[in-house]
Amino acid sequence: MIKFHFTLIFCFAFFLSYGGAISNQLSNDIKTGEIKVNVKKIAPEPVKWDTEIRELIFDDDDELKDGSHFMELFTPYRAADAAIVPISIKFRKNQNEEDFVKYITIVADENPSPIIGKFEFSLKTGKSDFSTRIRIDKYTYVRAIAEMNNGEKYMVSNYVKAAGGCSAPSLADMDTVMARLGKMKMKLIETGEVGQLNKAQFIISHPNFSGLQFNQLTRSEIPAHFVDSIKVTQDNETILNITSDISLSEDPSFTFHYLNTGGELDVTVTDSQGGVFSNKWPIEQILSSK
């Protein structure tokens, strides 16, 4: 009993000495937004990746290296909307002839179709940073896998808390969605003279139905209807070539870079129901519409 009382007194004294400081520090961290959480410590083991998905993409003898020394994946830890989850990939160096990113594969382990898309780059891309928006079906690891021109493969991943994105209804009614199908917009975010690195954003109006959604009026299933390829060129040189599946968000959007050679930007999009959409934007036309 004496030992118990001594322990209680010691704990009380410790709280008086340090409790206020801990409380004040926590309060300050909350106010300044500087609370840091080590996601790797609280995220679950990547069981599905280890047992199922890795072998869908790679051969057994493929070496997959940690890419955190030269690339970074940005995702929300907890997404505000699982149907529109923003992701960005940034690299610490530009494309060059000796060492450049050839492909990036985006994966969400727990999605019904885990391979979200494969993005092909070239020296014309200049810099392989890009951003897009994806659907997430349940809490999952999101991965970016870069394949270099020499065949080496690197991966970075984040754990994202989001659910229901693959079956979430469209943002508008069916008639409105289909009326604007295939409409495109190109926006220059950064532009310069010929030979300089430009940055642009491309958006296409498309429902990107996953096949898991229901018509909100009839409650009938909506067949899958999604963008499955996008190709962006300038002066007959490929800037970006995308092969995608059901996990891109409605109205797919991509931000990308390219080395400007002065010609118009040419985009061709196809979808899973045979739709083909194309458009061209002279640089001057894009600049005048800014």
PLM region spans:
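N-terminal edge beta-strand
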Residues: 54-82, 175-194
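Bacterial N-terminal signal peptides
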Residues: 7-17
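Short acidic/polar inter-strand loop motif in beta-rich domains
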Residues: 148-155, 271-280
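Aromatic sugar-binding surface patches on proteins
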Residues: 123-131, 246-257
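Short edge beta-strand/loop segments characteristic of extracellular beta-sandwich folds
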Residues: 74, 86-95, 199-207, 215-220
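Surface-exposed, short loops/turns at beta-strand junctions within beta-sandwich domains
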Residues: 133-139, 257-263
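Low-complexity, Pro/Ser/Thr- and charge-rich linker/hinge segments at domain boundaries
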Residues: 37-47, 163-185, 286-290
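Beta-strand signatures of extracellular beta-sandwich domains
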Residues: 103-107, 229-233, 268
